[in-house]
Amino acid sequence: MIELIESNLPVVTIDRIFPNRISIVSDNEKGITDLVSYIIEKKHTKIAYIHGRDSAVTRQRLASFREVMKQHDIVVPNAYIRETDYRDIQRTAIATAELLKLPDPPTCILFPDDYAAYGGINVIKAAGLRIPEDISVAGYDGISLATKIEPKMTTIKQDTKTMGMLAAEKLIALIEKPSTTEIVSITVPGILLPGATVASQ
């Protein structure tokens, strides 16, 4: 991917930000703000966050998570913050198991994405815990599978259709008018899907 980014070929990135490249990104800051605010409205204060590997997207999401918690005067223990890879079921399962073993475990776990969340959900069920009666969880992305399982995942749905359309339009513009196409980063808002995996405390 880096070779492509550093080449002279026309490139538009989706949910990745690189210097001197057009990018189409989901509004990660607002997405996490909306999601964490919803969880706090449900009276959760012990919220853990398993985030993805370091990237511009991850930094935006983590900063927003910390900011919302700070605004509500909620202290986040270092042990509640874990790192895994996006879409990595196995590593997310390990991180979830570590959180459950804490002396004061969280009442809600925020996963890096809906797909990786399945690793955590499997560990929670294997521990004999029920979602959301015993522990709440939330994902990110809003993949179609997340809306089909029971209980339905609480998540942020990214507007991938709009993002794809904008990326295609900008790529065509780069090909047809390379010297006049402005290098911009376009932010596309997502939407909160309340689902049923976050219970009131």
Each language-model region and where it sits:
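Bacterial carbohydrate/catabolite-sensing allosteric modules
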Residues: 5-201
